[in-house]
């Protein structure tokens, strides 16, 4: 395991990374002032670090100039920053994005799962950028067990994030394999958050922390403590919020989290849009606001 991957693994252990959204208008325009205030607010409210341009941040859809500007604003906050790379049809896209992330001071990259040779893709990123990587077991493209073992032996891989949503056995497998390989087991399980910690996850990188950060941070804090009732209560609050935001159509969760961020005053209404997700009925917005405590039940 490369020393840089060891350093990232150890730095992230026990932390909550907010998988930040990218606030934008209905037409996809990004206001960097809004982005700066939004990212700073996530950190102020309990995020130990930031994952930008990942699945929640719609990284594959954004131009290199916008990507660079978002990374710069995240890095300026002085917390660990992980950048999502890959997911675009460009063959060299992930390697180019990783080089940019490294040059701008990011601490690591979260590698979108791709078709074909996943290990080869990680190796190409490692050769191009030499930046520590977090593998990604995502519900839209789960990682086969043998491939996962190979990835977790790569010297540049610091850990793996599991985001399988409802596959408890798959989540448990990823956590076990990561720990056996001496890598960091990172939960991205918004719908199995408390259980994934009990199964051995050592850090969190979740889209649920794109708003209402304190709800997720309270679960992490309670888990580190010794009060089982506090952990149960905090997990219950998180589960109620996740039930309203991480539901079918699942890709709509980004829009739901942006609605919640707007309800909290983190972003203006004009920038609470996800033009890349499925259309959602307006009545869902009220359900999300109620789950977040912004409308009476």
Question: How should these model regions be labeled?
Answer:
Residues 2-144, 276-277:
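Active-site beta->alpha loop and helix N-cap motifs at the rims of alpha/beta catalytic domains
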Residues 2-6, 17-21, 45, 198-201, ...:
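C-terminal alpha-helical cap/extension of soluble enzyme domains
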Residues 30, 37, 65, 69, ...:
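Conserved active-site and cofactor/substrate-binding residues in soluble primary-metabolism enzymes
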Residues 36, 68, 72, 95, ...:
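Generic alpha-helical structural signal
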Residues 39, 98, 175, 193, ...:
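Short glycine-/small-residue-rich flexible loop motifs, especially phosphate/cofactor-binding loops
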Residues 69, 73-78, 100, 104, ...:
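Alpha-helical structural signal in soluble globular domains
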Residues 139-249:
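Catalytic alpha/beta core domains of metabolic enzymes, predominantly
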